[in-house]
Structure formats: C-alpha cells, structure tokens
C-alpha cells in the first residue's frame, strides 16, 4: 500500500461538526477499501487567498492515508460529488511526518503569550527623539523674495 497526504477544503458555512462528519465519512471509505487513516489534523477556518466557488474562507483538513490507489480514487470521486468540498489535493509521500504539521506548529507558535514589549532593545515610534542631522526650519537662512511689479 502507498502512503498519501490528503488535504481538503470544506465550505465556510458548514459547522465544525459537519467537517468532522465529512472526515469520518471519508475515513470509512478508505477503511472499506482496505486502507488506514493515520493522523487527522483540522486546521480550522482560514481565509483563502482568492475566492473559490464564491467562498472567501474554508475549513482546512489534513489526513495521512495508508491505502491502495483505488481507495484514494474513490475518496477523490466522492469529494468531486460533494458540494461541501471546495478543493482537495492528494500527494504520494515516502513516509509520513512524525509530530504536528507545519500549519499546527505555526498555530502553536502564534498562540504563545508575547513577551513584555516584544523587543526590549527597541522602542516604539515615539521615542526616536530629535534627529541630529536635520535642524529646525527656523535655523535656515531665508531666501530673498523677488518683487514682482
């Protein structure tokens, strides 16, 4: 059996419970055709780079699959039929990654509390002080005006 990573995008207006039901449905299809589903990661509702079928957001789901090719073809066929699935992509991999995916690591990193001031060696915009290379406008000599008559 071959190893696959499968990502699909579900419409924004379905609930997370309906997304979980889709995952269970596709798990059942894979297992019925002699395959196994390993890790399943729900990346949540994220903004799309561009609109897909009039949707600006989508639920992202990653599945690690160990199944024969006909099982994957059947899942893809059912995803084409289902109106709740906007896009899907299946990629054959040599081995499945251990631990959380890059998207989950990024989410964990973003959820961490920030340090005080974030960068103590740098201040905000207001603490720059006077610029020594530029004087005040009052220090400049005035240009003579030409009288127009």
Curated annotation (Swiss-Prot):
Q: Which GO terms describe its molecular function?
A: small ribosomal subunit rRNA binding; structural constituent of ribosome
Q: Which GO terms describe its biological process?
A: translation
Q: Where is this region: Disordered?
A: 93-149
* Biased amino acid composition, Basic and acidic residues: 94-149
Superkingdom classification of source = Bacteria
One Pfam family it belongs to: Ribosomal_S6
Please give the InterPro entries that the UniProt record associates with this protein: Ribosomal_bS6, Ribosomal_bS6_sf, Ribosomal_S6_plastid/chlpt, Transl_elong_EF1B/ribsomal_bS6
Alphabetically ordered keywords of this record: Ribonucleoprotein, Ribosomal protein, RNA-binding, rRNA-binding
CC per GO annotation: cytosolic small ribosomal subunit
PANTHER family from the entry? Answer: MITOCHONDRIAL 28S RIBOSOMAL PROTEIN S6, SMALL RIBOSOMAL SUBUNIT PROTEIN BS6M
Which family, according to UniProt?
Belongs to the bacterial ribosomal protein bS6 family.
| Biological role stated in the UniProt entry | Binds together with bS18 to 16S ribosomal RNA.
This chain belongs to which protein, by name?
Answer: Small ribosomal subunit protein bS6
Species this protein is from = Rhizobium meliloti (strain 1021)
